Amino acid sequence: MHRFRVLSILLLAVMLTSAACAPQATPAPTAPPPAPTQAPTAVPATPAAVQPTAAAAPAAGGFTVTDALSRTVTFSQPPQKVVLAGKALFMVADAIYTFPEAGQRIAALGSTGQGSGNFIPMIDPGFSSKISLKSDAGAEQIAAAQPDCVIMKSSNAATLGKSLEAINVPVVYVDFETPDQYQRDLKTLGTLFQNEDRAKTVAAFYQSRVDAVTKATAALTDDQKPRTLVLYYNDQGGTVAFNVPPMGWIQTLMVQTAGGRPVWKDANLGNGWTKVTLEQIAAWDADAIFIVAYFNPVNDVVTKLKADPQWQALKAVKNNQLYGFATDVYSWDESDTRWILGLTWMAGKLHPDLFPGLDMKTEAQTFYQDLYGMDATTFQSNILPKLTGDVP
């Protein structure tokens, strides 16, 4: 019995010693702290410093985006390889780049330039490393970039968009053609990038400036609204042509919002720019004429027109109200992000008494700072030298 007790004690001691020497189980790693669920809305001070804000964590099962065609597109997480494609791309790109995530999320894009230049390289230090697509790139070329989202204007849906959808590439359509569409499409991008705070900030930037103009012009009677004409000058092909925009385009909406009366509203307008004769321009004899020139220096065009005897007979020329539309990298009349500058500038030209002290250079600097994080030095060197048109 005594021997058995001794053996038992010895056996127990061996077992305890073995347990003490055995390797300990590695504890399970703790989960990393969750990413911030709200992105800061402030834009960094300089383009080079613009960093993507932390995207909100998508809800379980992902999130759904409703685009300009009322389609719903579901994502499991914010897209990391975005492609911008289709026609009229630069207008869409400029809006997308108001989100600081854009620079790192966009993997490939088509041409973002126009006749007067290319803005995106000024604000995206990584622009040269992105895949450059041809303007007529098809679905296969776009798919080769392996995007998890393609963004394009809805006008491309029936052609390029349909082909991408057929091979299961997620496509989100936007318009960015009118003030109302800007509010809607910014909200769409806010959901897509999971940065709704930034979408609200940019939308508020636009709305506050529209409200400032409409408040100033709200009490005007029709007789107090100058008869106004917007003309697109084009001499491509060696023949000079003047064109007026459709009633639903941003140029017409600018005139109406800025407190003017578009004289071409009863013309036989098409879906795009409509050519008009000099005889028709003379018949309208508008109080104020705004000249747009996308592929010519607008100041040179205005100088040429003022020297023409036929134009010298017009009321607007006699009263020094023939204006070259304000332009920097792109013209401010287009449905590019700069339309808000164009609206403010036009209102100041039509009703200088309602906008005393309006300084469009200051307005432009605020625009680039608030929407693109461009500091004063960069604005002075990259934007201000390009500012042309009737801007004092």
How does the language model describe each region?
Residues 19-94, 197-232, 355-392:
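Bacterial Sec-exported substrate-binding components of ABC uptake systems
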Residues 68-70, 128-140, 177, 268-278:
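Short helix-initiation/N-cap motifs at beta->coil->alpha
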Residues 84-143, 149-155, 263:
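A short, structured surface patch at a secondary-structure boundary
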Residues 109, 114-117, 157-161, 175-186, ...:
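Extracytoplasmic ligand-binding site segments that recognize negatively charged/polar headgroups
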Residues 186-191, 197, 297-392:
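Structured C-terminal subdomain patch of bacterial secreted/periplasmic proteins
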Residues 242-272:
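Alpha-helical, coiled-coil/dimerization segments enriched in small aliphatic residues
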